Design a protein with these regions (language model features):
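Extended alpha-helical scaffold and adjacent linker segments that couple domains
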Residues: 1-175
Length: 175
């Protein structure tokens, strides 16, 4: 299955699909890819403009700093892979104020993480193979999988954009 498309696989395709599925990838690799998408494509500016002033900000994905620290305010995107994702609104508000940061929880309603994980597994599987030495039929399957990885990465980019637009709004508790 690829999205809404179903197709029957040959034995070779099934073997490769199983090998890819069983390939392990570090969640840090996926988080790094999310950071690349967010801070290079969706938020390419390294500064926040307020009136005529520019303010540099530190870029975080989960607990990982992306790029160099500027020492100012922080912009932190939290993915479903982070333990921080399920903390209470009250904790998010307190941490935001204490650390001088804006915290954005990417929605779990979209499948950006899974798509990037599958793409990373495909890329890692291909890197481990000496493709030019494989039979032509296997090379064709691998080329199709490379195309699938590109499609998944493009889809994930759109899903990340969607996820940042479905953020959870934190409310201060009256008290």
């Amino acid at each position: 299955r690829n999205g809404d498309n179903y197709s029957f696989l040959t034995d070779e395709e099934q073997d490769i699909a199983i090998d890819i599925r069983n390939t392990s990838v570090d969640s840090a690799t996926i988080v790094q890819s999310i950071g690349q998408t967010i801070f290079s494509e969706l938020y390419p500016s390294k500064k926040y403009k307020y009136n005529k002033y520019d303010f540099a900000y530190d870029q975080y994905i989960d607990e990982t700093l992306v790029g160099a620290a500027q020492g100012g305010v922080r912009l932190r995107f939290v993915t479903v892979a982070s333990d921080y994702y399920n903390v209470s609104d009250q904790k998010l508000i307190m941490d935001s104020q204490a650390n001088n940061e804006a915290i954005i929880l990417l929605s779990s309603e979209v499948q950006y993480f899974e798509e990037l994980e599958t793409a990373a597994k495909i890329r890692k599987y291909i890197k481990q193979k000496n493709v030019s030495q494989l039979p032509e039929s296997i090379q064709d399957i691998i080329r199709k999988r490379q195309a699938q990885a590109r499609t998944l990465e493009e889809s994930a980019k759109a899903q990340i954009d969607k996820a940042r637009n479905k953020i959870r709004r934190c409310q201060k508790q009256a008290g």
